[in-house]
Regions:
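Amphipathic alpha-helical hairpins
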Residues: 2-154
Length: 154
């Protein structure tokens, strides 16, 4: 019975992370639209972040399917870990580099918190934990890059 409960919890954690990655994709798609034409470098960076989240989603979804469960393809409005990215998307009011980057950083903070919370689940199998730690490391690097760029335009 404990194994089934652990599997259920693992599936829930993975699906929540799929949803936060969906939020991240949606957020960066919005950021691309809100970014001025002359800020092509930011558009390329945001496209890279979108690709990163797609890779994360594929890896997470593969594990969910391997466990015989259905993949949650929504966003965190129906999830449990963090809904912050949706709030971030709603506050895109300015189109200057600093504002766009500041909003992206807030979204990255939400993703960081989601992965931190996910890794607090002690019942995660070691191979899942290893995958999440790797994804978390990539997200940390992305966060730091966004923050560094934001600070340049403060």
């Amino acid at each position: 019975m404990i194994i089934m409960q652990n599997t259920k919890e693992t599936i829930e954690v993975l699906n929540d992370l799929i949803q936060i990655n969906n939020d991240r994709i949606t957020g960066y798609e919005k950021a691309i639209k809100e970014t001025k034409a002359e800020d092509e470098d930011l558009k390329v960076l945001f496209a890279t972040m979108i690709a990163e989240s797609h890779r994360n989603k594929i890896a997470l979804a593969t594990e969910v399917q391997t466990m015989g469960a259905e993949v949650e393809n929504g966003t965190t409005t129906s999830g449990k870990i963090y809904r912050a990215w949706m709030d971030v998307k709603a506050v895109f009011t300015g189109h200057d580099r600093h504002t766009v980057l500041a909003n992206c950083e807030a979204g990255e903070d939400a993703a960081k918190r989601a992965y931190h919370t996910a890794l607090e689940h002690e019942s995660l199998p070691a191979y899942i934990r290893e995958m999440l730690v790797q994804q978390q490391g990539n997200l940390m690097a992305s966060h730091d890059e966004i923050k560094s760029l934001r600070d340049q335009y403060a």
